[in-house]
Amino acid sequence: MMNHTPLLLGIRERLIFALDVPSRTQALEWIDQLGDAISFYKIGMELLASGEYFQVLDDLASRGKRVFVDLKFFDIPATVAGVIRRLSQWPISYCTIHGWHAPMMQAATEANTSNMHLLAVTVLTSMTREDLAKMGINREPVDVVVERALAAHMAGMSGVIASGQEAAAIRHAIGSGFSIVCPGIRTNHVPHNDQQRTIGIKAAFANGADAIVVGRPIRMAQDPQAAAEAMQTEIMTALTEPST
């Protein structure tokens, strides 16, 4: 079942917290600490290595939270299709697949038998043009991102993961009805760390983002719940104030 329509998000579901922790115990501590400030959680590779990944997925679902499985699958089409077929049995809202191979993405969409929405990873926000050149791709990141977004759209994917810096170009190329989820969000006084193509909250939504993924700016805050609530307020303002 090709579920290529965008996921309908409530206004407080547009802030996705990156639950990048090494254990279920720490995951539950963060879920309890953030409370109603966060309704959508991304769980990735670090938790997978703990052996407690699907317990955390169940923990989130039982608390009424949306789940984003961020494992960035990249393999031959048959293998990725098999994984997606199994994941379709779980209460997952978003799941990522690398956007480097159109047949792999199409196989994944055809294997999806649930309301899970598949997102293509375009170019990691930790990568620069120089990084792409070292991989033999001598092009601007935005051009590669748009090309992969178009391929994902043609393959029936629901949307993409991309820097907010490229969201406007994606929206111009594809239009509405295609989800753009943006990591690499940085607020004032928060180090960029390994993120390169970063953007602020207001700019990301102005460029056409549907949702943002935030990890360290919340985890590193003196009061993480207050930081998350402040971001929710900024998102609401960005989505409701008239554009200039």
Swiss-Prot record:
InterPro entries registered for this protein in UniProt: Aldolase_TIM (IPR013785), OMPdecase (IPR014732), OMPdecase_AS (IPR018089), OMPdecase_bac (IPR047596), OMPdeCOase_dom (IPR001754), RibuloseP-bd_barrel (IPR011060)
Annotated GO biological process: 'de novo' pyrimidine nucleobase biosynthetic process; 'de novo' UMP biosynthetic process
UniProt keyword terms in alphabetical order: Decarboxylase, Lyase, Pyrimidine biosynthesis
SUPFAM superfamilies attached to this UniProt entry: Ribulose-phoshate binding barrel
Pathway membership: Pyrimidine metabolism; UMP biosynthesis via de novo pathway; UMP from orotate: step 2/2
Catalytic activity: orotidine 5'-phosphate + H(+) = UMP + CO2
Keyword Lyase attached: yes
Gene3D superfamilies reported in the protein's UniProt record: Aldolase class I
Catalytic residues as annotated in Swiss-Prot or TrEMBL: 72 (proton donor)
Record-level Gene Ontology MF annotations: orotidine-5'-phosphate decarboxylase activity
NCBIfam families on file: PRK00230.1, pyrF
Oligomeric form and interacting partners: Homodimer.
HAMAP family: OMPdecase_type1_B
Name of the featured protein: Orotidine 5'-phosphate decarboxylase
UniProt source species: Xylella fastidiosa (strain Temecula1 / ATCC 700964)
Lineage, highest ranks first: Bacteria, Pseudomonadati, Pseudomonadota, Gammaproteobacteria, Lysobacterales
Gene behind the chain: pyrF
